[in-house]
Amino acid sequence: MTAAVVQADQRDLVRADIQGVVGGSYWHTTESLRTVEGTSKTRELLDYLGEPTGTEAYLIAHERRVAPGDTDGEGARAGCLHSLLTHVNSAASPTGPVELFVLERRLTARMANNDARTKARLLADGRITPGTRLYQTSPNDEQLLWLPDLVCSAYRHQITGRTPDLFPRISAMCTVLP
């Protein structure tokens, strides 16, 4: 699971720039990496994201082991979400505390409720601030959701060795969380 932190005054610019690279308002990294042209666009987007003058920050919560009984991966997701929310909502966040988290819409209400329960537990434990909000939407409606998808795919390809030149393009901007 990956978070991309984009400052409020940069969001419109970043949206316009990534749509310009893609040439439209639709992007899916996994789908794009299946073609030569899509892989080229992926590299171009990652080069944009990795630009050293940018203010974006990318955080990766890497759950190394999915428990044997976690057949749907929801436990691992909750662990990753816990790591991201507590880090990005704290003073340790590279851009200062963040309270609005925009997530890709989950497939089912049950899955969305699992995320809400994770947030509620963190709030009850005092791990996140009361103003913390989760908002779920589609990457078709919020192009900034392309960023965590790109970063996560690049990181995964680094681990698997499938396309090892992707992650180095953004690695300086990334923090891998436990």
Task: Please place each PLM-identified region on the residue numbering.
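Phosphate-ester processing/binding pockets and catalytic centers
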Residues: 1-178
